[in-house]
């Protein structure tokens, strides 16, 4: 594979997604390999010790995929991504990152900067295990998320009581 300035394709869009997710912002995510995409590719290549020619051959593509896999894995572990862990920054991967950022009070810009990575790689160990009979703010948080996903929490909605509904 070889992607160069002037190309227009879905692969270019996925390249742009990947670059943006890794904080090498190509500005547009439209599948058009323009000057900004070339500059982002060069910055990425330089940072990874690759030949900085702005062209995306197998070496650059495979390195990009290997950098995306940990993000996909973390997003999948957090329940935001349900696709294949393949390193391709497709629409589902990119949208999962933006949704994760939005849900966690982060800037939803699709760039996995330090704040996003810190939040993505932490576990919520300070939250209690919820079970039938549990009450409180964590139950409300769970119920609210379930309702948002289209599930019913009984006639009372998010009432803070973990019941049969």
Locate predicted features.
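Cell-envelope/ECM-targeting effectors and their regulatory/trafficking segments
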Residues: 1-165
């Amino acid at each position: 594979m070889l992607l160069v300035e002037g190309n227009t394709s879905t692969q270019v869009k996925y390249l742009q997604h990947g670059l943006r997710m890794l904080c090498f912002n190509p500005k547009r995510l439209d599948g058009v390999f323009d000057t900004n995409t070339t500059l982002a590719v060069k910055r990425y290549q330089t940072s990874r010790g690759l030949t900085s020619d702005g062209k995306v051959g197998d070496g650059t593509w495979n390195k990009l995929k290997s950098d995306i896999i940990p993000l996909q894995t973390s997003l999948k572990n957090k329940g935001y991504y349900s696709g294949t862990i393949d390193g391709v920054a497709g629409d589902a991967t990119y949208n999962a990152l933006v949704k994760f950022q939005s849900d966690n009070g982060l800037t939803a810009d699709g760039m996995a900067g330090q704040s996003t990575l810190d939040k993505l790689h932490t576990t919520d160990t300070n939250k209690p295990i919820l079970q039938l009979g549990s009450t409180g703010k964590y139950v409300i948080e769970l119920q609210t998320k379930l309702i948002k996903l289209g599930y019913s929490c009984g006639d009372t909605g998010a009432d803070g009581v973990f019941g049969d509904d």
